[in-house]
Amino acid sequence: MNELELLGPRAYGEALGRAVLKATAEDFQVDEVLDIPLSGDGEHLWLWVEKRGLNTEEAARRLARAAGVQLRTVSYAGLKDRQALTRQWFSIQLPGKADPDLSAAQDDTLQILKSGRHKRKLQRGAHAANGFTLRLTQLDADKDALNQRLETIARQGIPNYFGAQRFGYQGGNLGEARDYAARKALPEQRAVRSRLLSTARSYLFNRVLAARVADGSWQKAQVGDLLAFTDSRSFFPAGVDECSDPRLAILDLHPTGPQWGEGPSPAGGATAALENTVADDESVLRDWLVRAGMEHERRILRLPIGRLTWHYPESDILQLEFVLPPGCFATVLVRELIDLVPVGQTDSSCVF
């Protein structure tokens, strides 16, 4: 499957050109934002770690080996990309133990920048946001058009699609999920099960969002919508009055789409009709999610781009800096601007 099939239409028109992303790890930098002051004592050792060309799970395994503990005692808030320079927190549970020597875990791909003790372990999803610095190199695009589109995005946000990375190479994760769903089976390995269930939910969400981008309703509240604030998982129904809430205009409040689970869509009106139609069209995936015990959740359809700035360090480089909530994809912003080409290739666009 290609990117258009996995995500959906762009909100602001065709790509304005093309560029390369991730020619080096430094071209894609991620800093986890965690608003948790450490207590200074406790059985959990928290580590601020810089990784280069190393994903989160590999880093956790390396820390566990160096500390001489089981992998399950190492915790992290979120998964970060391998092809990037990332800084994120880990915690290691060490009841009654001194701080271990972690030098064996460190090399050119992993450095511990600071550490401290805390009374609790680091919970999944505990980070407040992710800060990004992206460098798009070999840029071939009109800068005036790019600047205008970036200004529009800063004012209006972008569709909050799950990025193509969620679905694996050419949508391979979705193919695996469909195979298990058709057999009414679940993977035995917990990590595989989680990955494929997330893939299926993400695809159904993207189908709904794609339809609302196509009809122009993705950033507008309509009666029957369920509305949520940017940083909240709770939601409330939209009536006539809620559809004119001024917080919609300033990108604090947004319509939401389904993270599918048990039961029909809790939305109403045209929103429920669309969501249930998508679920009925993909009934095998929907029923698989329900049998797996997934609960219905919501995700905002519109993604505000926090603290968005940009400049051109060189004539063929665009540098973007911005902040996104957890679980949102930086590459979805890039997609609204340009097509990406693989490193060393300039004659055709890359599905990314």
UniProtKB/Swiss-Prot annotation:
InterPro entries membership: PsdUridine_synth_cat_dom_sf, PsdUridine_synth_TruD, PsdUridine_synth_TruD_CS, PsdUridine_synth_TruD_insert, TruD_catalytic, TruD_insert_sf, TruD_pseudoU_synthase
One BP term from GO: tRNA pseudouridine synthesis
Keywords: Isomerase, tRNA processing
Taxonomy, superkingdom: Bacteria
Gene Ontology molecular function terms on file: RNA binding; tRNA pseudouridine(13) synthase activity
Enzyme Commission number, as recorded: 5.4.99.27
Catalytic activity from the UniProt record: uridine(13) in tRNA = pseudouridine(13) in tRNA
Entries under SUPFAM superfamilies matching the protein: Pseudouridine synthase
CDD domains: PseudoU_synth_EcTruD
Residues annotated as domain TRUD: 157-303
Single GO cellular component term: cytosol
Active site per UniProt: D81 (nucleophile)
Pfam families: TruD (PF01142)
Protein family (similarity comment): Belongs to the pseudouridine synthase TruD family.
Protein task: Responsible for synthesis of pseudouridine from uracil-13 in transfer RNAs.
Protein name per UniProt: tRNA pseudouridine synthase D
Species, as recorded: Pseudomonas syringae pv. syringae (strain B728a)
Native organism taxonomy: Bacteria, Pseudomonadati, Pseudomonadota, Gammaproteobacteria, Pseudomonadales
